[in-house]
């Protein structure tokens, strides 16, 4: 068992380890992806404990969960391993889709939760994003990608000094890796594009050397990711957007940059986000 060390800290959460491993290979002549996520989190506040009492596992109709394990390590050193009865399944009443989650018990301030899962899924090779930074400190973060020797991947890092590098010692398969230590958390700020501000990686399948085919460009990657983060609107939503847009006074002769600045200023002066909730607002 690894020996995780925590120095005295007033932080509410610290990631001792976060690791993502994804491997592409051919299974019955079909390209398949196995995706592993492993996290070790030190929790030191009631809010964070409540947040991580349940950890939801990914669900997709074209994927299956092939392995998972979780445990709690208390300050005293006592270890509580989650057995099968603590890996629960729930159902979304609206969509009918089912999902699994870890139901942690016995977490106290200063406890560590550790979990991993392995998912078999349809390969995401036309553009995928891996977040490296978040709103809490991280001691160690790793990313590894393995692929058959004929499939070449491209990588880009954003808001990071470290880049993905190829492991030249790997011969039976291609291997790219990324590792970084001691990352500071990035605070969430109102009206700030948080997902664009944190450090993250993007990767995509670039070339199949078996037939010398270029698979996809970063323009296609950007389109795929944009469609994922900003899905299309309904007809009713489009009408509301058009109605709202008419309130913004923009001269048709303005260039695109000035139009963007005018829209940005209008949104900041007229749109407010409230953290409070009330049934009467529904």
What is the role of each PLM region?
Residues 1-121, 126-137, 141-142, 281:
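Lumenal/extracellular ectodomains and adaptor appendage modules
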